[in-house]
């Protein structure tokens, strides 16, 4: 069995299918790990959702910020909707309710075999197992009766740092922001949400979340996406896979067993290495 971890798809369904074919993926024996942001900005979010859902247990996807945005507008309507999203086809689909219900069941974090898959990252003070427990708190709300209320309170940049005594919507918001939006943070874990450039553009006293010298999760390989300006980055304890397909760059897969890289350019297949 091979596991192929794939970066942010964001509705780039044609490139996604080309990449899956290039990998030689066999759904009867292999698995896809998808780092979230299945939807939005690209042209084929509906086809992407339908295909991933059809794979059943052969695909594991975590939730990204764009997936959560889809849930929000599905339940809250036009309030807070961005003018240039590409999600109307999903919202008008005959199987919309089934797809949205399925999306609500996806995990915020997946932990398996020394790997932790999460869309954006983990705060420097979090280790993998406790972080998984925090993710379950959010998952329980998303799949339960409080989902709509939570989605109404989910957006926001504060609090910017984790505290164990946080409660209610603030607690859940910090967990979601760390796992789906974070790029840079301070040594004490205060997140910065405006800076979206490459690592060398970090604001003063900020580092990429994975570069903190005392990162508590350094014994776990984090598989993530979200940061297209970072691009493909492979370190002993990091696989960052957002290589900017929706921006005209590449969609990337890495086979976990040997770290072989497979890539498809937006519009052209690149091959593997």
UniProtKB/Swiss-Prot annotation:
InterPro entries for this protein: ApaH, Calcineurin-like_PHP_ApaH, Metallo-depent_PP-like
Keyword Hydrolase carried by entry: yes
Entry's transmembrane regions: none
Catalytic activity annotation: P(1),P(4)-bis(5'-adenosyl) tetraphosphate + H2O = 2 ADP + 2 H(+)
Pfam families: Metallophos (PF00149)
EC number: 3.6.1.41
Keywords: Hydrolase
GO molecular function: bis(5'-nucleosyl)-tetraphosphatase (symmetrical) activity
Keyword Hydrolase: yes
Function: Hydrolyzes diadenosine 5',5'''-P1,P4-tetraphosphate to yield ADP.
PANTHER family in the record: CYTOCHROME C5, PTHR40942
HAMAP family for this protein: ApaH
Family that this chain belongs to: Belongs to the Ap4A hydrolase family.
Name the UniProt record assigns to this protein: Bis(5'-nucleosyl)-tetraphosphatase, symmetrical
